[in-house]
Curated annotation (Swiss-Prot):
This is Histone H2B.8. Residues 1-38 have a biased composition (Basic and acidic residues). It comes from Arabidopsis thaliana. The modification N,N,N-trimethylalanine is found at residue 2. One of its GO terms (cellular component) is nucleosome. Can be acetylated to form H2BK6ac, H2BK33ac and H2BK34ac. Monoubiquitinated by BRE1 to form H2BK143ub1 and deubiquitinated by UBP26. Required for heterochromatic histone H3 di- and trimethylation at H3K4me. May give a specific tag for epigenetic transcriptional activation. It comes from the Eukaryota. Residues 1-45 are annotated as: Disordered. The keyword Disulfide bond does not apply. GO terms for molecular function: DNA binding; protein heterodimerization activity; structural constituent of chromatin. InterPro entries: Histone-fold, Histone_H2A/H2B/H3, Histone_H2B, HISTONE_H2B_site.
Length: 138
């Protein structure tokens, strides 16, 4: 009869010890799941990167009294994304041709000259050079 009593005591202690330990992680898991779902919703909203703010700032610098519609803003945003993608492809192609592992400001400048036409490329190069010198000086 002594072995039965010995078996009952550890068995009685183990479930009593496990039950509170199991309940705490379950409660913690529920909190993390609820918090995780809220964080996921916030992350999906934050991941949308647009240039709308910057387009609007430039518009107000050029024409302070003129607004822009949502469709026009979407078109401008896709236009900027398209131009950046073309510049990135061209600069990466130039780096590959020259057997260089990195894209420097020189590749970007050459890509701008190749992608953008005429006077627009000249203005873009001068503004880019000005921005790079301002960045390196500070």
């Amino acid at each position: 009869m002594a072995p039965k009593a010995a078996e009952k005591k550890p068995a009685g202690k183990k479930p009593a010890e496990k039950a509170p330990a199991e309940k705490l992680p379950k409660a913690e898991k529920k909190i993390t799941k609820e918090g995780g779902s809220e964080k996921k919703k916030k992350k999906s909203k934050k991941n949308i990167e647009t240039y709308k703010i910057y387009i609007f700032k430039v518009l107000k610098q050029v024409h302070p009294d003129i607004g822009i519609s949502g469709k026009a803003m979407g078109i401008m945003n896709s236009f900027i994304n398209d131009i950046f993608e073309k510049l990135a492809q061209e600069s990466s192609r130039l780096a590959r041709y020259n057997k260089k592992p990195t894209i420097t400001s020189r590749e970007i400048q050459t890509a701008v000259r190749l992608v953008l036409p005429g006077e627009l490329s000249k203005h873009a190069v001068s503004e880019g050079t000005k921005a790079v010198t301002k960045f390196t000086s500070s």
